[in-house]
Amino acid sequence: PIGKHFYNYYTNIVQTIDTPDLIRSGFLVTYKAYQMADDFSNLKKGANGDYSEKSQYEHFNKEKLYDGVIEEWKKRANDKKTIIFNCNIKHSDETAQAFMDAGIKSYSVTSKTSPADRERYMDEFENGDCMVINNTSILTAGYDFPPIECVILNRATDSLALYLQMIGRGSRIFPGKNNFICLDFGGNHNRHGLWSQPRQWELSAPKKKKKGEAVVKDCPKCEAMLYASAKVCEYCGYEFPIVIKSLKDGVMKEYYEKDMP
């Protein structure tokens, strides 16, 4: 939604160009997303309506999660300029240090970073051998560095606007860049769907999806995130079985798209 109470003042909203249109027109590049399965029921909302920094830090500040981020990055984005969004300053600093400990040059840019250090860190990221830049929100909106080819969501958010802004940092066109990768460790694709999907903007709050209703799913072969309704993986060609249940005898049988009449 555009605003909680805008429907009190306006009756219509002008639908303009959407992300899929910009991708088709060549103004943005598409992406491939991977999401880590995890339980986020322990996260609590703060006064701003989003998940609190405290509950997020308690969830994400685990050695296995730091190791998991580095492992997935090495597996899928080892040679790509990467921006990471973390839940708070301490988390950003510690994630950067975890990469450094693994032999990967990485910096953390936050509100506590001195102007001189910030300038040096950003220069080394954009023009030098630093592959990974960490932040909390400083680089969320307005930061434009087209060579970025990997965005890591090392946090959770219930804000669709923030979700779109963070992932959008990787969508800028650049010579030789056909797409970018998003590694989602915060379950955000389950909340908001694919960054590249069409959206119908409304003045009032959208209807909440039913509990257990899937927004996206992962391909069991290549692990990429897809629309929940996808029948074939657009990346590796895997065909999802169509399961049909016989009401008479309760026997389940798998059918593939090519087998359907």
Annotate the PLM regions:
Residues P1-A33:
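Post-DEXD/H (motif II) to motif III coupling segment of the RecA-like Helicase ATP-binding lobe
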Residues S159-F180:
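Conserved SF2 helicase motif VI
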Residues D93-E94, I104-T140:
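Conserved helicase ATPase core of P-loop NTP-dependent helicases/translocases
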Residues Y57-A102:
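Conserved strand-helix element at the start of the C-terminal RecA-like helicase core
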Residues G26, I133-V151, G168-R172:
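SF2 helicase motor core recognition
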Residues K74, K81, R199-P261:
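Long, largely alpha-helical accessory region at the distal end of helicase-like NTP-driven motors
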Residues M36-K54:
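Short, basic/glycine-rich phosphate-binding loops at helix/coil junctions
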Residues P20-V29, F174-A228:
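A conserved SF2-helicase RecA2
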